[in-house]
Each structure stands twice: as structure tokens, then as C-alpha cells.
From Swiss-Prot:
Belongs to the Nudix hydrolase family. PCD1 subfamily. Probably mediates the hydrolysis of some nucleoside diphosphate derivatives. GO terms for biological process: nucleoside diphosphate metabolic process. This is Uncharacterized Nudix hydrolase NudL. Its cofactor is Mn(2+); Mg(2+). Gene3D superfamilies: Nucleoside Triphosphate Pyrophosphohydrolase. SUPFAM superfamilies: Nudix (SSF55811). It is an enzyme of class 3 (hydrolase). It comes from Escherichia coli O139:H28 (strain E24377A / ETEC). InterPro entries: CoAse, NUDIX_hydrolase-like_dom_sf, NUDIX_hydrolase_dom, NUDIX_hydrolase_NudL_CS, Nudix_NudL.
Amino acid sequence: MEYRSLTLDYFLSRFQLLRPQINRETLNHRQAAVLIPIVRRPQPGLLLTQRSIHLRKHAGQVAFPGGAVDDTDASVIAAALREAEEEVAIPPSAVEVIGVLPPVDSVTGYQVTPVVGIIPPDLPYRASEDEVSAVFEMPLAQALHLGRYHPLDIYRRGDSHRVWLSWYEQYFVWGMTAGIIRELALQIGVKP
């Protein structure tokens, strides 16, 4: 695939053709969800946020909108949509959910389900000042280019954990966010 020519139609057909295998076992993890917002354009974008530097956890990191599943959420999809509205003012009704990726275990004890959704290009994003310091869009073709990610093995509590690192403009994309983007690339058939 030529990355400069990634169209939304190609992305959608590949995503729907190669449905991810989901293991529904939760292993008593707390549940969380993130929205992977794909901006509907001829050359689609990927919406990301930079977390506020004042947050207790993951301060200043690039992330997808998302958070813990609340008792009021009907599902992980509902949680992802609620969090996206709270963090960057994306109305749930504006999101066309096309599926989910396999859940990812976080270092903070959550099982995080990435929810993939298509959003209109003209939404007026409004960052929640308490949680988000920046909202930016990365071309999806660049985000899914696996060559931009570099591995780093981190040792924590006697275990090795591989994390992925990348830069986009002034933003350092790494950890779970980079791992989810890589998983999305692999899901649509991008070869490492």
C-alpha cells in the first residue's frame, strides 16, 4: 500500500474485511475504553489529544479520548463516546462506530478497549481544560506507517514490556497510544 494514497474507502474496506479477534475475558481488570476518531476526509486523519500536564496519571502524554467505564455506561462503546464528548466535545451522535480492536492491558490495571469511529471533518473541537492541553490531527496514512515506530523494552517489577515510540511534529507518541495505532495498522493489513 502506498501510504500517501490511503483513502477512507480503502481503510474502511480493509478494517471490515479483517475483523479483529476479540477475547472477551476480562480477568477481573477494571474496564476502560478509548475512541480512535478517524476524520472523514478523502485523505483521512487521526484525531489525538495531549493530556494536561496537571493530571496525576499520564500527564502531558499523547492519547486518544477515553477513560474508565462508569456504572452509567451501557457498554465500552458508550464509555468511549461519553469520554470523547467530555474531553473534546465530540457529540456521540456524530460518531459512526465501525468496530473495536482487541482490548489492551494498561500498566495502571485497566483493560482498555479501543473503539474505532468515523467523525465529520468540520467538528468544532473544544478541549476540556482539566484533562486536555491540545487536540491535533495526524494524517492517517502517516499514523499507520509502521516504519515510524521504534521499540523500547522497559523492565518493570521483573517483567519486560515492549513499548513503541514515534514523533509527529512536536508530539511524542508512545506507549499504549502508539501500540494501539500499530495494532490498527496491522489490523488493516499493513506489513511490518
